[in-house]
Regions:
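Aromatic- and glycine-rich peptidoglycan recognition patches
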Residues: 1-20, 28-32, 96-97, 120-181
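N-terminal hydrophobic or amphipathic helices/low-complexity stretches enriched
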Residues: 28-47
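A broad detector of the eukaryotic-type serine/threonine protein kinase catalytic domain
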Residues: 52-56, 110, 156
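Catalytic cysteine-centered active-site loop
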Residues: 50-103
Length: 181
């Protein structure tokens, strides 16, 4: 019996966990298995990368963007199809988001659906404001709060709704028969 003890021997030290070293193709394989970014993050990264690009009315390219053209291309980069105008973008998603629940990637609409931006972080949005300006990140001012109409969170559920609508718009119009007497 050990002095002062209850007759128990000290526990043997645990073996350290084995280490694994990856080389060459193994490293590449692990890198390729990374978790993909969520769609909102891909879209937000796209929009933020376009900061400094000029506003061009009707624009949706590297030459320039209007507000809805920027959102269209940002979410297109994330694999989500949006309609062209701000009003159509707002109407394409049934789930509306209120001001207090805004998150990065949400599309925010202002001025009777005449303008759209994307939440970049709490209290800020990235957007293409108007002629003579550039794509930029900007604080959501009190004026914006007062002009706020609503917001949407583009997601796969909304995409299906928009895809159905788009398919209907592309369907051929029924033939109209006319008779002459």
């Amino acid at each position: 019996m050990a002095a002062g003890g209850a007759g128990l021997a000290p526990a043997a030290p645990a073996d350290p966990a084995p280490s694994v070293t990856l080389t060459g193709p193994q490293v590449k394989q692990v890198q390729e298995q990374r978790v993909p970014k969520p769609a909102w993050k891909v879209a937000l990264d796209y929009a933020m990368d376009k900061r400094g690009t000029p506003y061009v009315w009707g624009g949706a390219s590297e030459r320039g963007y209007d507000c809805s053209g920027l959102m269209l291309r940002a979410y297109e980069d994330a694999g989500i199809e949006l309609p062209r105008t701000a009003a159509e973008q707002y109407g394409a998603f049934s789930r509306k988001i209120v001001w207090k629940d805004l998150k990065p990637g949400d599309l925010v609409f202002f001025s009777n659906l005449g303008h759209v931006g994307m939440i970049s972080k709490p209290g800020f949005m990235v957007h293409s404001p108007h002629t003579g300006d550039v794509v930029k990140e900007e604080r959501l001012s009190q004026w914006r709060r007062q002009a706020f109409v609503g917001a949407v969170r583009p997601d796969p559920k909304g995409v299906k709704r928009w895809a159905d609508y788009t398919a209907l718009r592309k369907a051929p119009a029924p033939a109209m028969l006319t008779a002459t007497l």
